[in-house]
Amino acid sequence: MSEFATSRVESGSQQTSIHSTPIVQKLETDESPIQTKSEYTNAELPAKPIAAYWTVICLCLMIAFGGFVFGWDTGTISGFVNQTDFKRRFGQMKSDGTYYLSDVRTGLIVGIFNIGCAFGGLTLGRLGDMYGRRIGLMCVVLVYIVGIVIQIASSDKWYQYFIGRIISGMGVGGIAVLSPTLISETAPKHIRGTCVSFYQLMITLGIFLGYCTNYGTKDYSNSVQWRVPLGLNFAFAIFMIAGMLMVPESPRFLVEKGRYEDAKRSLAKSNKVTIEDPSIVAEMDTIMANVETERLAGNASWGELFSNKGAILPRVIMGIMIQSLQQLTGNNYFFYYGTTIFNAVGMKDSFQTSIVLGIVNFASTFVALYTVDKFGRRKCLLGGSASMAICFVIFSTVGVTSLYPNGKDQPSSKAAGNVMIVFTCLFIFFFAISWAPIAYVIVAESYPLRVKNRAMAIAVGANWIWGFLIGFFTPFITSAIGFSYGYVFMGCLVFSFFYVFFFVCETKGLTLEEVNEMYVEGVKPWKSGSWISKEKRVSEE
């Protein structure tokens, strides 16, 4: 984990250093004494072989399981809107007696989930500050379950299903804030990027298995088509609640609440060492100094997020932009409407093609678990933006110029369709190893503890709002301009490349306290990869 780092409070032109010695003296009157900082100043949790991290990896996978229920929803809803029983119950009848979902109703059913997520992230994420990240996660999963029950109970009223989507979205919004937060505050710094990426890994697993379940139920003629996938998600949510009982609470939250012995036990459990280990004492020293610094600054407010004090505002803006740009890569164009898209390119069984996309997405995320800590956040984001832009140029150009050589009322070109599917798979590969996990990693690492949940809620809320806009308007836009829609996302990807270069700092290999120090110092993003903390600079001298 981290070395001892002196925390600082900026007050006007004065700089006050807050050392951990007073905190240690205070603790000696409250709980079992902790050795003074001088004995362990240079103690640090060293990097270990991967086998030594199996305990914390398993814990982080359980915390990240919240991403699975989100991914399952994304994977299943893309099939629901094309299933016969779903359209019969919640759609409208044509003059020939067949049923369909209008563009408006499809957009609302698919997109409203994201509005629920945005609202849930902004409101329910606060539970993590009140009751702890772990208990907060359990509460928001319960909200999600309520929404699932309402959807399962829907019979023929589309607005009942619509309401259930809003409520389940609120639960997922809370999960999206609390799950990466708890992982980032629990995982050792050497594998923190990888562990936070588990959240995206679980999303991709959920999408893939959701596609598979749709394929398995599509031949039924009744509500089994969509109620079975929803029922399975209910079971998965119950499993996550049970799993949270085995997960330790965030040591940083515990220190903030004065539960120092519990914090030491949490750190020791995550790192497979004893609570007396010098590195645990040094880590506690660092966390306590940082928490005390934030406590002296007073209670956090929403207004503080929009002030320049402590370089908070630039980080809030960066988080909003990163999460917005993740949606504007165009990934959900494929994930929400993949089945519809591949119907358009002439695939006989578009459900099978969606499964292929799910496999590519899931398998590629394993690559991201390696690259995020090997190459760093900035390089992965920059490379992902460039690669995905190229994929969209080819996908859209082929779709516009070659897919229908004899007109849209004639059969499509199989060769052109195959090229589009190949570049769709390549797009998903590049997305899965870059923007998919790292957008969550960046926001989970960038904020100080006292404003973290609120800042993350705003950032992730921006993601959900863009998700709604894309989910709702995509049917209308594709009806109007077809595959030229891809050029819009290509432009967004070009913008994202330059935004990352000029505004996103590298956080690879830094403790959360060091990340905060780097932002306070005002390090230029393109120079952040070589930045080292003040304490390390002093020790090297």
Curated annotation (Swiss-Prot):
- TM regions (residue ranges): 50-70, 108-128, 135-155, 163-183, 193-213, 228-248, 328-347, 351-371, 380-400, 419-439, 457-477, 485-505
Cytoplasmic compartment segments: 2-49, 129-134, 184-192, 249-327, 372-379, 440-456, 506-541
List modified residues, type N-acetylserine. Answer: 2
Tell me which Pfam families the record gives. Answer: Sugar_tr (PF00083)
This entry's comment on induction and repression of expression is: Repressed at high glucose concentrations.
Q: Which GO terms describe its cellular component?
A: cell periphery; fungal-type vacuole; plasma membrane
Ranges facing Extracellular side: 71-107, 156-162, 214-227, 348-350, 401-418, 478-484
Q: Any keyword RNA-binding?
A: no
Which Gene Ontology biological process is one annotated for this entry? D-glucose transmembrane transport
UniProt keyword list: Acetylation, Glycoprotein, Membrane, Phosphoprotein, Repeat, Sugar transport, Transmembrane, Transmembrane helix, Transport
Q: Which residues carry this modification: Phosphoserine?
A: 11, 13, 17, 20, 32, 266, 539
Q: At which residues is Phosphothreonine found?
A: 29
Q: Where is this region: Disordered?
A: 1-22
- Output the superkingdom of the source species: Eukaryota
Question: What subcellular locations does the record give?
Answer: Membrane
Q: InterPro entries, alphabetically?
A: MFS_dom (IPR020846), MFS_sugar_transport-like (IPR005828), MFS_Sugar_Transporters (IPR050360), MFS_trans_sf (IPR036259), Sugar/inositol_transpt (IPR003663), Sugar_transporter_CS (IPR005829)
Query: One GO MF term, please?
Result: D-glucose transmembrane transporter activity
How this chain sits in the membrane, per its record, is:
Multi-pass membrane protein
Primary place of residence? Answer: membrane
Glycosylation-annotated residues: 82
Q: Per the similarity annotation, which family is this? A: Belongs to the major facilitator superfamily. Sugar transporter (TC 2.A.1.1) family.
Q: Report further notes.
A: Glucose transport is thought to be mediated by two kinetically distinct systems, a glucose-repressible high-affinity system and a constitutive low-affinity system.
Function, in words: High-affinity glucose transporter. Is only indispensable for growth on low glucose-containing media, because S.cerevisiae possesses other sugar transporters.
Q: What is this protein called?
A: High-affinity glucose transporter HXT2
